[in-house]
Amino acid sequence: GEEWKTAFRTRYGHFEYCVMPFGLSNAPASFQALMNDTLRPFLDIFVVVYLDDILIYSTNELEHRTHVTKVLEKLSEANLFVKLEKCEFHVSKVDFLGYVIEPSGISMSPDKVSSITTWPRPASIKDIQAFLGFCNYYRIFIEEYSKLASGMLKLLKKDTPFIWGTDQEASFTSLKEQFVTGKV
């Protein structure tokens, strides 16, 4: 392996990580590449993978058992292991990466929707970026997202002073309402 790349020395000796440590700038990309390579035969056929979140989807229970077995075998071949307490097997409704996925369709996770109700009015450019970043993640559910966000987007233009006005308040309020009223 590549463990030598993480080596460091202290007065207590020479050390190398045996597992992927948190904090390395390329760790997420490297791990995603590993997961993609490991599960490549199944990607977009019956598997979606994002870092350590794996979604296995099937049309019936028998097919699902086969899919789960294939994925677990591939992970085992790559010396990757799952924690059973973090797994959900044979469910028809799952919360995955902030979305609720079920046979009837995809929706936003209710806890994400409820968090928007208490979101404070942005007081800086960074606050606007954080709010719009959150909203942008769910933009597929928000009709005319660009139009609704335009009031706040105006403040993100270069050399524009941060002055919160009626356009920005209307933009902020209408986006929050889209999440809360269920019109997403």
Locate predicted features.
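Conserved polymerase palm-domain catalytic core
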Residues: 1-38, 96, 155-159
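Histidine-centered active-site/metal-ligand motif
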Residues: 63-67
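C-terminal reverse transcriptase regions that engage the nucleic-acid substrate
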Residues: 26, 34, 45, 50, ...
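Short small-residue beta-strand/loop micro-motif enriched in glycine and branched aliphatics
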Residues: 15-19, 57, 115-116
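Short, hydrophobic/aliphatic alpha-helical segments
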Residues: 6-14, 84-85, 118-121
